[in-house]
Amino acid sequence: MNQPIVFMFSGQGSQYYQMGKELFAHNAAFRQKMLDLDDFAVSRFGYSVLKEMYHTGNRLSDPFDRLLFSHPAIFMAEYALAYALEQRGIRPDYVIGASLGEYAAAAVSGVLSAEDALDCVLEQARIVTETCRNGSMLAILGDPALYQDDPLLGEHSELASVNYHSHFVISGEREHIKKIMDDLREKQIPHQLLPVSYGFHSALVDQAEQPYKRFLAQKSIRTPFIPYISSATGEAETDIQADFFWDIVRKPIRFREALQFADSRQKGLYIDAGPSGTLAAFAKQILPAGSAERIRAIMTPFHKEQTHLQQIEDSILSPPGRRL
């Protein structure tokens, strides 16, 4: 039996200025889809995401944390990459979404049209910026048990995700996260502040719930035609209701369970369609030893995207008997 292909889509924290720029310059399918989606964003809200994303004054090292731009930019880059892969004959047998990446997974699997998915992302960014106070998200490289054992973490943050045995993310108010960072620094526990201005997957976004649910109720949601595995539940979704797209903002991210669910069915080839290769890095820690060859990333801050894309195409389409 052919090895199934699984596309993985990551969320906030994986973005950076100039992401996908090499593909935009050299891959016609990626560029055209990005332009089409940007036209939709301009028509919907009056501003170009691409102009912000690829502005020459915005350096790779600058934090890309303006939600009105970073939210749609992540979706656009992920969906355009999935489209470019499909145009080369590389089509997913499953999709896995994580946090904001659930929208790209939903669009690729047919749950939402690409335009509706982008509209949901744009509206979510607008509502969150208008109704929610700022917050922070912090990745911690340590045993997730630390969250329960350290009173400072448990009392002043919420657990946003456990990504693998030594990596988890918390959300909280900015001043609380700063205190936690000081404490972690004293204890020499590695950590990284994510380029996110709001505390997703925590009570800090609760003010957005009702207006966003009213907006979601207007959307046409379909049954996926490609199996869709969600990190909101850690399993396959078949009967998706509108409120699901609020849950992916508010509930903890269960990517580890989602990946294990997928791999327990059949050992797949996992292609990270996110901007940073974040989920590919997580997958190498989650799946059994010897699985690294089944895990690929294309976009990274170090570029070489065309090379990575060609390597994947060669490995998938070249062997005899592999379906196109």
UniProtKB/Swiss-Prot annotation:
The keyword Cell inner membrane does not apply. Gene3D superfamilies: Malonyl-Coenzyme A Acyl Carrier Protein, domain 2 (3.40.366.10). It is an enzyme of class 2 (transferase). One of its GO terms (cellular component) is cytoplasm. InterPro entries: Ac_transferase_dom_sf, Acyl_transferase_dom, Acyl_Trfase/lysoPLipase, Malonyl_transacylase_ACP-bd, Polyketide_Synthase. The active site is at S99. The keyword Repeat does not apply. Pathway: Antibiotic biosynthesis; bacillaene biosynthesis. Pfam families: Acyl_transf_1. GO terms for molecular function: acyltransferase activity. Keywords: Acyltransferase, Antibiotic biosynthesis, Cytoplasm, Transferase. One of its GO terms (biological process) is antibiotic biosynthetic process. Its EC number is 2.3.1.-. PANTHER family: POLYKETIDE SYNTHASE 37, POLYKETIDE SYNTHASE 44-RELATED. This is Polyketide biosynthesis acyltransferase homolog BaeD.
